């Protein structure tokens, strides 16, 4: 997705340090950042924030982190958080490769990856969020019962991710090869998911855990 540059976005985000971490000021203190000590769920690559803000509104007993590196998109997540008055959702504006700088070992209960960039060329495989380098980070920050939820419309990325996770020592608790056909009504659509689905694209989904988190 090409993002149109918003020159004012960075200053806007910096004006809300209570909601947005721009430079790691809360690194290593994620739990303390929230008003209540509750389980932490992360969405990596939140886009415009429809998924994560809907989850946060539905589950006030869970603390959520939206992690998105594009400042020109993050402002839309911030707008939603403010409009909805969410106190259980914070935003990190940084790259996922920095995850273990922000979260302590075992601090996270769930990670969401929704419609991540597939990076289709083989030479870019290490940039995929299900590449083994990222899986190692997820394993480090997830607690013993933690899991990973993954959705995509890209069949190639889905197949790659199944193989990558399996080789890394993960197992799958749920696999949907046509999510919207099998959906029980609990699925929360992202902005892109609705667009892809309206075009007739098949949506793939899985839930996975590590055999040994540590």
Curated annotation (Swiss-Prot):
Q: In which pathway does it act?
A: tRNA modification; N(7)-methylguanine-tRNA biosynthesis
Protein origin, superkingdom: Bacteria
> What's its top-level EC category?
transferase
What GO terms in the biological process aspect are recorded for it?
Answer: RNA (guanine-N7)-methylation; tRNA methylation
Q: Which PROSITE patterns match?
A: SAM_MT_TRMB (PS51625)
InterPro entries named in the record: SAM-dependent_MTases_sf, tRNA_(Gua-N-7)_MeTrfase_Trmb, tRNA_methyltr_TrmB_bact
Pfam families, sorted: Methyltransf_4
Reaction(s) catalysed by this chain's protein: guanosine(46) in tRNA + S-adenosyl-L-methionine = N(7)-methylguanosine(46) in tRNA + S-adenosyl-L-homocysteine
Q: Write out the entry's keywords from A to Z.
A: Methyltransferase, S-adenosyl-L-methionine, Transferase, tRNA processing
- CDD domains (alphabetical): AdoMet_MTases
Q: Where is the active site?
A: 117
Keyword S-adenosyl-L-methionine included in the entry's annotation: yes
Q: What is its EC number?
A: 2.1.1.33
Name the NCBIfam families on file: PRK00121.2-2, tRNA (guanosine(46)-N7)-methyltransferase TrmB
What is the name attached to this protein's record? tRNA (guanine-N(7)-)-methyltransferase
Species of the source: Staphylococcus aureus (strain NCTC 8325 / PS 47)
Gene this protein is translated from:
trmB
């Amino acid at each position: 997705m090409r993002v149109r540059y918003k020159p004012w976005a960075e200053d806007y985000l910096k004006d809300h340090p209570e909601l947005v971490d721009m430079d790691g000021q809360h690194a290593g203190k994620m739990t303390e950042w929230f008003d209540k000590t509750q389980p932490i769920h992360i969405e990596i690559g939140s886009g415009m924030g429809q998924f994560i803000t809907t989850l946060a509104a539905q589950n006030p007993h869970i603390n959520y982190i939206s992690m998105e590196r594009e400042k020109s998109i993050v402002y839309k997540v911030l707008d939603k958080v403010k409009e909805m008055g969410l106190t259980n959702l914070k935003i990190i504006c940084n790259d996922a490769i920095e995850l273990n700088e922000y979260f302590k070992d075992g601090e996270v209960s769930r990670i969401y990856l929704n419609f991540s960039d597939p990076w289709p060329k083989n030479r870019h495989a290490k940039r995929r969020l299900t590449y083994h380098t990222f899986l190692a980070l997820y394993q480090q920050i997830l607690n013993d019962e933690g899991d990973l939820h993954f959705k995509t419309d890209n069949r190639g990325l889905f197949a790659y991710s199944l193989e990558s996770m399996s080789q890394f020592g993960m197992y799958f608790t749920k696999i949907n090869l046509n999510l919207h056909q099998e959906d029980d009504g609990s699925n929360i659509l992202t902005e892109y998911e609705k667009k892809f689905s309206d075009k007739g694209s098949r949506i793939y989904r899985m839930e996975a855990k590590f055999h040994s988190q540590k």
